[in-house]
Structures are given as C-alpha cells and as structure tokens.
Amino acid sequence: MQLILLSGLSGSGKSVALKALEDTGYFVVDNLPASLIAALIETIRASSEKVAISIDARTGETIATLPNTIKQLNASGVDCRVIFLEANDEALARRFSETRRPHPLADKISGGMIACIKEERRMLADIAELGHRMDTSDVNPNALRGWIKDWLKVDRSRLALAFQSFGFKHGIPIDADLVFDARILPNPYYDPLLRSLTGKDDKVKAFLHADLNVAHFIDDIASFLVRWLPSFVRDNRAALTIAIGCTGGQHRSVYIVEELAQRFGSEQQVLIRHRDLG
C-alpha cells in the first residue's frame, strides 16, 4: 500500500493538495487524528492501494504520536511518505483575512491570528522534519497542484533534487535546504527588451550565457553539489531543496535553475519549481 500523510499549517494549501491527490487516484481522508491512522490502514488495506490522509493541529496533541506511527507502518510493509506544507506568517494571516475564516486554534489561543499561527507552527515543528517540505507562501493553487503531481513521480528510494527559483523581494523560501544568491550577476531587467521576459526565454538565456561570471556561478554550485551529494544521501534525505534567488525571481534565478536541472537531470531525480513566476 502507498500511504501519503499530508500535514502542514492551516491556510498553507492542504485542501488543494488533498484534492490533487484525489484526482490522481488516491483514497483521501481529511483531518484524521494521528492515533487512528494505524487502525484505519488495517481496515482499508485490502481494498485501497493508494491512500492519502490529512493531519493538522485540529487533531490536538495526538499528532505527537505520528513519528512512531510512521515507523510502525513502514515496518508493516506500508510505503509511507510525508508532505508538509507551510507558508510565512504574513501569507497565512492574509489568506485567513481574505476568506474571513477564524484560525482553528482561535478558541484556544489568545493574542490574535499571528499568535495562533506561531503556536500551530510550534505544535507541528517535529512533523515538518519527517518528510518533504513545500513553502506555499507565494504559490497559487494551480502551481501547488503541479508541485504535488511532480512529487508523486519521485522514486523515494533515491534522493530527489528540487531546484527552486525565487525573488528575494518576496522572501526566502522557508523550505530551502541550500540558498544561493544570484543578485551579484548581471540583471536582464535593466534591458528594456528583456524586462518582460523570463529566464526561460531565448533572449534572456543568450544574455546570461554570454557572461562568464554566470557560467562560473553555475559551475561552482554544480561542483558543490557533486562534492556533497553523497553526504546528503548518507543522511537519508528524501529530497534536497536548492533555492536560487535573484531580485524578483524572474530572470537570473529561473535561468540558473533550468541550467542546473539540465545538468543533473540525467543522473539524479530532479524537480523544478519557479516560485515567483505567475
């Protein structure tokens, strides 16, 4: 049986992710207490090959039992994987304001929305380290659905490299394992003919390809990864998120992510995410 445990902060997009899993053939269960997971799996094991269960702070402190539950499930032959969705405080508060919904912890925590978000983040901190983290702060629902479907294709027995572009003016991705700053490189934004384009467009690629510093920057990151990937593998990582940032996340970071993904794609599992492209 394939089991995906979907957890994360309220407002981070779990409903969207759960629907994406359902659309790909998973039997989904929303907001199941962690203490009931093993019993549910035992009940439906014979009839369902792919199951996705959403778990969040509404289940209370029983979520602390999740790490041990995962170990038991894996030992019993269940292929258990964890996705953890998160976002920064400002993005979460904005989403609750837009939907005019109270935070699930509002009746238990005083101090307003931000206090509730921080308490939930504390409650789920250990769970965040169990699986693949996705920062949805500046990600729209369609992009998140794409991320989930790409992640499902990953062979969990091998380390996956997730190359992610972003703009520093929108904040550093909180799910990044490694962050590289490409703002020191020439910026196509200042060429009026390139300003509206992205790092995927041929004219921008030609502009950046012509600069030796860009090539050295990419070579240095690639060399670092080649040198240290064996250590990350020995650390039993399921995925390694390498975030490349420029000012707006439109030109330089996008180009570098595409170049790195192409270099490593023939030998490694590669995921590409452009966080700040529309």
What are these regions (language model features)?
Residues I114-I242, D276-G278:
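C-terminal accessory "lid"/substrate-recognition subdomains
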Residues A17-L18, V257:
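Post-Walker A alpha-helix
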Residues G13, H251-R252:
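Conserved glycine(s) of the Walker
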Residues E61-I63, D89-F96, P104, N142-A143, ...:
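Switch/connector loops and helix/strand junctions flanking conserved nucleotide-binding motifs
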Residues T24-L73:
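Conserved nucleotide-sensing/catalytic segment adjacent to the nucleotide-binding pocket
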Residues L6, I242-C246:
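Hydrophobic anchor at the beta1->P-loop junction of P-loop NTPases
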Residues E22-N31, A261-V270:
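Post-Walker A helix-loop "phosphate-sensing" segment adjacent to the P-loop in P-loop NTPases
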Residues S10, G248:
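The conserved Walker
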